[in-house]
Regions:
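Conserved acyl-donor/pantetheine-binding loop and adjacent beta-alpha core of acyl/acetyltransferases
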Residues: 70-81, 87, 91-114
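Conserved N-terminal entry element of GNAT/NAT acetyltransferase domains
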Residues: 1-54
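Active-site rim helix/loop that mediates acceptor-substrate recognition in acyltransferases
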Residues: 34-82
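Broad hydrophobic/π-residue packing in well-ordered secondary structure
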Residues: 4-6, 14, 84, 95-98
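Short amphipathic alpha-helical surface micro-motifs
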Residues: 13-16, 65-67, 108-113
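Intrinsically disordered, low-complexity regions enriched in small/polar residues
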Residues: 19, 23, 34-38, 42, ...
Length: 114
């Protein structure tokens, strides 16, 4: 068995990140494809802007994928997606999203007093 290496995502690993998501992350035919693990770190307004951009690209799965990918590229370059890539030799084979709790807009909600 090959040794697995774990590396924190950084802009210099952008190519590996997208190679993983474009070619291996959903090779099982998952209904979640396309995904770049970025929507969790986006506000509702940012997601709506991404949807609008997808419509400008012609809509459908291709418009959505292009908009989603462009948004993810920008987020990786600015350090807004944080996590770890797993490598088998030089090939990215796994991903773990590990951002700050407050950056998971869909999950983090301040406690409400009842």
């Amino acid at each position: 068995m090959n040794e697995i290496t774990i590396k924190a995502l950084s802009p210099d690993l952008e190519k590996d990140y997208f190679d993983f998501f474009d070619n291996r992350a959903f090779s099982d035919g998952s209904p979640y494809y396309p995904c770049y693990c970025n929507a969790f770190n986006m506000s509702a307004g940012e997601i709506e802007a991404m949807r609008d951009q997808a419509k400008q690209y012609g809509g459908g799965i291709e418009g959505w994928k292009r908009s989603l990918r462009e948004t993810a590229v920008r987020m990786v370059r600015h350090g807004l997606i944080r996590g770890y890539l797993a490598f088998d030799n030089d090939l990215a084979v796994g991903w773990c999203n590990a951002n700050d709790r407050t950056n998971f807009y869909g999950f983090y909600r301040p406690c409400e007093i009842i």
